[in-house]
Every structure is written in structure tokens, then in C-alpha cells.
From Swiss-Prot:
Residues 76-473 are lumenal. The lineage of its organism: Eukaryota, Viridiplantae, Streptophyta, Embryophyta, Tracheophyta. It comes from Oryza sativa subsp. japonica. This is Xylan O-acetyltransferase 14. Residues 1-17 have a biased composition (Polar residues). The active site is at residues 184, 450, 453.
């Protein structure tokens, strides 16, 4: 039995709390764990003694104070066996690194800057030189002749973005595993990382192996791997198949992530993203199983719970539930002393040209998306409206702050603002098509232009330079 409820009104986006206050049964185990921890702490303090003199009382009280301090130190997070670890870095939307400018001093916000045309130093590699180039990103191969999009360098205000050095990066990655987890935009970034490594150290022995949702790029001399795991909605969903994921009735199991986590639980560096696949008014959330729905339906009917199977809810609320599940897993399973966690902010789309064109041009030409665009948007203050929903960003920020309070550091890599200006850097019509282009599409190229993903070399290389700066610096 599937129950479809009406979509609740979108909450005030200035007050997104990342799922605080939810009453789902799936999170009952957290309350039980907290109660057990409280009970344990109560037992630790429940000491009764018989004192014979004021002097012995003072000595005993001092001893109890020392014991209490020891108990407090070893029972942080309710786990006395937990390995001590350093306090985490703060997880704001913008991460600041020491300035590398000649003026020196202070810190530099790598996410605030401008695009500078630099034909001498960019791109970081040639498309034809990358032996592992993605067919979806090979814009030059598929007919794009205006190559200015390859030569733009991101210039932060007050410092320089470190140039990607493959040998230095692999030195940090020796005997380690880096995993990108997310949707096709995270795969876009993973493909960029492979090209940066492949062209930066072409003499190395590398190999690629795929097993369903997991693809592994192995650098044998370093015993290192850079993997991509397909998980477009972070939690389990009916879009998890790496090829057959275009489904009309998109459904998520907002409280279930273990099936995915099994594939990246031993990673040393994890890079997550999830946004694009949530861009619809409502989402069906399933509390049963994709594998045995009949049994779940029968159990729900027997218990008289009409919402035990599924319910259609506002997509933002579903996203908050999913990100909370992700954060809960990180809190209780990640190795704080070993694993570095990153979350990429929203990659913007350029589907509506009227967002950057003046009114007259928009009225005369109609909407053409990114088709025919060859230059970035110059205005630093430009903000797109249709391609990014900041309420989703705030949901991630809220969970990152919550994890930070629990000594789990998540660095948010803010690629949204710098990428918003690059309307020129999408594949548009210059990519491989898995289905033949129709005559109608040929008459109106903008109707099938890809204004979501990115050409390589291009914008995702800058994302990886930002990631590189955090890992290496």
C-alpha cells in the first residue's frame, strides 16, 4: 500500500535546520543511545562513601575529582573506548587558507575572486593528452572550435590558487584511497582529477576497473586509488543503478545509507555531493525495502500504519532527512583521526539565458540556455536564480556544523559562486549522444544543449585545485 500525501508548504528557507525536530522512528535508536550514555554517566557519578574525618573527606573528594576528570575524558561522545583525536577544523561555507601573495600575512578566502584569461598558463592539460578523458566532457573532440573556455584561471582576491602538482598530490595519497561519492557532476569532477593525474604523471602505471556503481582508478606505484561511487541522492534510492537510473517515480529511503557506505567506509578521503537530483517539487520517501516491498506492505497493513511504506513530501524536507542520515553515519562510523571529509556545494546550471542577458536581448532572442555562449559573466556580483536553491545549501551547512560540534570535521568546498559565472564552459551540443539527435532538435540546438555538466579541461579542474589546496597545503 503506497500512500501519497499532499505536498506540505515550503518552510521559510532562512530557518532551515537540517532536519532538527524530526520524529521519524528511524532515529529512535539515537535517543536510546543517548539515554544509555546518560545512564552510564550517572553510574560513574553514583558513588557513596563513609567518611571518618574532615581530613579523609578532603582526600577522598580530591581523588573523586581526579577520577571524574578521567571519566569525562574517556567517555566523550558516550564511547569510553574511542581513540583520542584532535579538535576538528570549523566547517563554514568558505574555508580560508594562509595567503600566498607577496604581501603575506592574514588569510585568503580561495572562494572569493574573479576569472582571469590566461592563455600562457592554462589549461592545466590538453584534452587530447588525457588518456582517460570522459566522452561526456570532450567538447573539443565533439566539434567545439571556440576554445577560450579552456584558458580561464580562477584568481582569488589577495592570493593565488595553488597549481595542481600531480607528484605532490600522489605523495599525500600514497597507500590511501580517495573516493568521490555522488551524482554525474561529482563524476565530472572525478574525471577531471583523473586527467590531472594522468597528464601530470604520464609515466605511471594506472588502471581502471568498474563494478556496478563503483569505478576504481588505481595508481600502482603509489598503491593509491581515486574512485567514483554512484549515489546521486546520498541515501538509497531507486536511481542507484549506474545506468538505469532515469525513473519517473523517483523514491528515496531517507533513513538508509549502509548499503552505499559499505563501498566507501574504508576511504581515507571522501568527497561528497548531492543536489541536482533533488530538484523537483516533491519526493517519495520510502520507509520499507526495495527488495521485498510485499512483506513491508503486509506488515504495515497489519499494524494499521498508513505511512509505514511511503509518503510524498516536500523535496527540501526529504533532502534534510537524507543529509541527516548521512551525518549520523559520519558521526558514528568515520575514523576522526584518519578520514578527511569534503562536501562540494551546488554546481550551478545555465538553463535560462534571461538570467544574464538584459531585457531587450532576452525578449529578442528568447531563451537559448548556454548554447552559443563563449565568454564568462563578468560581474562578480552575479547570482543565478533558477540553478541554485540556497535552502539546500543551508541544510548541508547545518549538518556540517552539527558534526563539527561532535568533533567530526567536514570541509565545505564552495564551488557555487565561482561556477555561476561560467555560462561558457558547458558542453552545450558538443558531446557524445547515446541516443540519435532528432531532426527537430537539429532545428533548435538549444533544446538539447547540455548546460548542466562541464567541458574538460575547464571548471571542474578548478574545483580540484581547491580540493588539492586543502589536502596538500
Amino acid at each position: 500500500m503506497t500512500t501519497t500525501g499532499s505536498t506540505p508548504p515550503r518552510k521559510n528557507r532562512s530557518n532551515v535546520t537540517g532536519g532538527e525536530g524530526g520524529s521519524l522512528e528511524e532515529y529512535a535508536w539515537r535517543a536510546a543511545g543517548e539515554a544509555a550514555a546518560a545512564k552510564k554517566a550517572t553510574r560513574a557519578w553514583g558513588v557513596s562513601v563513609s567518611l571518618r574525618s574532615h581530613f579523609s573527606s578532603l582526600v577522598l573528594l580530591l581523588l573523586l575529582l581526579l577520577v571524574a576528570l578521567a571519566v569525562s575524558a574517556t567517555t566523550k561522545n558516550g564511547d569510553p573506548a574511542e581513540t583520542p583525536h584532535a579538535p576538528p577544523l570549523p566547517p563554514p561555507a568558505s574555508i580560508k587558507l594562509p595567503s600566498s601573495s607577496s604581501s603575506g600575512g592574514g588569510e585568503c578566502d580561495l572562494f572569493s575572486g574573479r576569472w582571469v584569461y590566461d592563455e600562457a598558463a592554462y589549461p592545466l592539460y590538453r584534452e587530447s593528452a588525457c588518456r582517460v578523458m570522459s566522452e561526456q566532457s570532450a567538447c573539443e573532440k565533439y566539434g567545439r572550435t571556440d576554445l577560450r573556455y579552456q584558458h580561464w584561471r580562477w584568481q582569488p582576491h589577495g592570493c593565488d590558487l595553488p597549481r595542481f602538482d600531480a607528484e605532490k598530490f600522489l605523495g599525500k595519497l600514497r597507500n590511501k584511497r580517495l573516493v568521490f561519492v555522488g551524482d554525474s557532476l561529482n563524476r565530472n569532477q572525478w574525471a577531471s582529477m583523473l586527467c590531472l593525474i594522468d597528464t601530470g604523471a604520464p609515466e605511471l602505471h594506472t588502471s581502471i576497473n568498474s563494478s556496478r556503481s563503483l569505478t576504481t582508478f588505481k595508481i600502482h606505484e603509489y598503491n593509491a586509488s581515486v574512485d567514483f561511487y554512484w549515489s546521486p541522492l546520498l541515501v538509497e534510492s531507486n536511481s542507484d543503478h549506474p545506468l538505469r537510473h532515469r525513473v519517473a517515480d523517483r523514491t528515496v529511503r531517507a533513513a538508509s545509507i549502509n548499503k552505499h557506505a559499505a563501498h566507501w567506509t574504508n576511504a581515507d578521503v571522501l568527497v561528497f555531493n548531492s543536489y541536482l537530483w533533488w530538484q523537483r517539487p516533491a519526493m517519495k520517501v520510502l520507509w520499507g525495502s526495495f527488495d521485498n516491498p510485499a512483506a513491508v506492505v503486509a506488515a504495515a497493513a497489519e499494524e494499521g500504519d498508513e505511512y509505514a511504506v511511503s509518503k510524498v513530501i516536500d523535496s527540501l524536507r526529504a533532502y534534510e532527512l537524507a543529509v541527516r542520515t548521512w551525518a549520523d553515519w559520519m558521526e558514528f562510523h568515520v575514523d576522526r583521526a584518519r578520514t578527511q571529509l569534503f562536501f562540494m556545494t551546488m554546481s550551478p546550471t545555465h538553463l535560462r539565458s534571461d538570467e544574464w542577458e538584459d531585457a531587450a536581448a532576452a525578449a529578442a532572442g528568447g531563451n537559448h540556455g548556454c548554447y552559443g555562449e563563449t565568454e564568462p559573466i563578468a560581474a562578480e556580483e552575479y547570482r543565478g536564480t533558477s540553478g541554485t536553491d540556497m535552502a539546500f545549501a543551508r541544510a548541508v551547512e547545518a549538518e556540517a556544523r552539527r558534526l563539527g560540534e561532535r568533533s567530526v570535521a567536514v570541509r565545505l568546498i564552495n564551488v557555487t559562486r565561482l561556477s555561476e559565472r561560467r555560462k561558457d564552459a558547458h558542453p552545450s551540443v558538443h558531446r557524445r549522444y547515446w541516443d540519435p539527435v532528432t531532426d527537430e532538435q537539429r532545428r533548435n540546438p538549444s533544446s538539447y544543449a547540455d548546460c548542466i555538466h562541464w567541458c574538460l579541461p575547464g571548471v571542474p579542474d578548478v574545483w580540484n585545485q581547491l580540493l588539492y589546496a586543502h589536502i596538500v597545503s
